[in-house]
């Protein structure tokens, strides 16, 4: 086992055109509104998606080009409301869209969204370790596995397969293929083509590049994670369109798609997406809220994701408050033998390891926010999904609503910035499990991700109320972690599938698409 595991590797400039505004954009504005569209021509810029591990671009000023956008109406999240045109944002790579497509996003051909230069296949004969190395090298989340060159019905290898492989190596799961099990546990190379057959998957959906977004919405809105885009003759795969790339494209170009505005202005509660009561049984169209206690070992979290066929899991405390998020892609942090002890430490501890790792990689503290509130607008939710590159966000009860019957409006820019700054300073003083990373890296308490992704906290929020800890109390890591990172009681979840399904039902002909059909096809395992 050791020999097999040791083969895994360790893991803009501002626009010169400034908007004529007399004030700085607030955090709420930046997060709740899509980027401005500069004057571009079709195929002016390469539509390249950022690598999976890269930091989202800094929000900088960029003036809209002539004729690209009429004066847009405001998008709503928290009060007060702001006009779209008030927010200076930078151009994003996906904005290669001509204004002729305004209000007609359903008719855009799929050829606009594919990345031909990023299409990579691997043969099924290579080992799981080599396939994993390819994911890391090219910053991918999945990769097609060919049985032969030009295979049009191939499987895909992703981090769910890697998680299954790790659990098989550790003898935590069993499969019918006894030879493959023996090879895994004896440290022999295992062909990736055999491994991908063990994890239930959806069919390899294919659509020609001349099909429209309206067509693909019906497939991705059913819970299928990715679709292959072929040439018009359907004889060659030209690209892969994932749920996440589709959402990023729609968000980056939302100013051109004015028909989306009423939905973007609406709250999750009003749109009836996401499970908003963890105690009640979800409907057939809703995702279940799947979580794990922070004190449970990491290996149980990985096992639970494998059994439930999910790509991330919420970590909660004993009172049901959200502590953090563990994604199946985080399995890359435990693929070497030297990292195996982490598997038997708590999920709470692993979250701190992930944060430390991000700090070392990016040179600054990183604390992505994976939660929204029932009152959060769809616009804010999309912005967070794009910025965190995640497939789902956890819906939490606002902190003050669980302790006081009198609700207070959430404060905006200056309060949020002060809260983030205070939290970052507390981290630098050794208040959180991130402190070791903080002391050895450059602290940037006003980094774009930290400030733009922070929901404005309430006056009762623990991020504001906690004073710097005394040296005597700084060793009490669990309590400090719970106070510093708790965001509210977990009451629901909203996923990319939920949002794409909503758009498909509301604005395309796919009125009856079921967001849970693909997951039911993949199935959960009863062990």
From Swiss-Prot:
It is found in: Cytoplasm. Residues 1-75, 424-478, 508-527 are annotated as: Disordered. Residues 114-175, 198-256, 283-342, 443-512 form the CBS domain. Keywords: CBS domain, Cytoplasm, Phosphoprotein, Repeat. The modification Phosphoserine is found at residues 94, 458, 524. One of its GO terms (biological process) is endocytosis. InterPro entries: AMPK_gamma/SDS23_families (IPR050511), CBS_dom (IPR000644), CBS_dom_sf (IPR046342), Ssd23 (IPR016711). Present with 2840 molecules/cell in log phase SD medium. GO terms for cellular component: cytoplasm; cytosol. It holds the Pfam family CBS. The keyword Phosphoprotein applies. Belongs to the SDS23 family. Its main location: cytoplasm. Residues 1-22, 55-74, 424-447 have a biased composition (Low complexity). This is Protein SDS24. GO terms for molecular function: protein serine/threonine phosphatase inhibitor activity. SMART domains: CBS. The gene is SDS24. Involved in DNA replication and cell separation during budding.
């Amino acid at each position: 086992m050791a020999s097999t595991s040791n083969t895994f590797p360790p893991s803009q400039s501002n626009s010169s055109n400034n908007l004529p505004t007399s004030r700085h954009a607030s955090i709420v504005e930046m997060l709740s509104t899509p980027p401005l569209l500069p004057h571009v021509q079709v195929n002016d810029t390469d539509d390249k998606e950022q690598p999976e591990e890269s930091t989202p671009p800094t929000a900088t000023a960029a003036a809209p080009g002539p004729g690209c956008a009429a004066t847009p109406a405001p998008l709503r999240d928290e009060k007060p409301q702001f006009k779209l045109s008030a927010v200076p944002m930078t151009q994003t790579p996906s904005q290669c869209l001509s204004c002729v497509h305004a209000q007609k996003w359903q008719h855009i051909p799929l050829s606009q969204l594919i990345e031909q230069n990023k299409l990579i296949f691997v043969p099924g004969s290579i080992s799981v370790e080599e396939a994993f190395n390819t994911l890391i090298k090219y910053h991918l989340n999945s990769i097609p596995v060919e049985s032969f060159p030009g295979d049009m019905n191939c499987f895909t290898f992703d981090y769910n397969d890697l998680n299954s492989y790790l659990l098989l190596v550790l003898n935590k799961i069993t499969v019918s293929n006894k030879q493959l099990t023996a090879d895994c546990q004896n440290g022999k190379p295992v062909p990736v083509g055999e491994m991908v057959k063990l994890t239930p998957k959806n069919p390899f959906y294919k659509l020609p590049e001349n099909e429209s977004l309206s067509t693909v919405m019906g497939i991705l809105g059913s819970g299928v994670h990715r679709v292959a885009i072929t040439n018009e003759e359907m004889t060659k795969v030209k690209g892969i369109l994932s749920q996440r790339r589709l959402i990023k494209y729609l968000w980056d170009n939302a100013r051109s798609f004015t028909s989306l505005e009423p939905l973007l202005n609406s709250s999750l509660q009003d749109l009836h997406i996401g499970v908003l009561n963890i105690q009640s049984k979800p409907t057939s169209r809703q995702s279940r809220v799947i979580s794990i206690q922070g004190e449970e070992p990491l290996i149980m979290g990985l096992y639970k994701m494998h059994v439930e066929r999910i790509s991330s899991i919420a970590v909660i405390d004993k009172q049901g408050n959200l502590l953090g998020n563990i994604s199946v892609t985080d399995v890359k942090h435990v693929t070497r033998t030297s990292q195996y002890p982490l598997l038997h430490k708590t999920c709470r501890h692993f979250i701190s390891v992930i944060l430390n790792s991000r700090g070392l990689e990016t040179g600054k503290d990183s604390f992505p926010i994976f939660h929204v509130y029932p009152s959060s607008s769809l616009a804010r939710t999309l912005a967070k999904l794009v910025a965190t590159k995640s497939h789902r966000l956890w819906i939490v009860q606002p902190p003050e609503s669980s302790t006081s019957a009198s609700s207070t409006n959430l404060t905006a820019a200056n309060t949020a910035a002060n809260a983030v700054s205070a939290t970052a300073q507390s981290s630098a003083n050794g208040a959180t499990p991130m402190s070791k990373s903080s002391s050895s890296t450059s602290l940037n308490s006003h980094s774009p991700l930290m400030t733009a992704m922070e929901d404005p906290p309430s006056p009762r929020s623990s991020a504001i109320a906690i004073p710097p800890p005394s040296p005597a109390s700084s060793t009490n890591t669990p309590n400090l972690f719970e106070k510093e990172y708790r965001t509210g009681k977990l009451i629901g979840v909203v996923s990319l599938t939920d949002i794409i399904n909503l758009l498909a039902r509301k604005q395309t002909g796919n009125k009856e698409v079921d967001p849970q059909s693909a997951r039911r096809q993949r199935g959960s395992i009863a062990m």
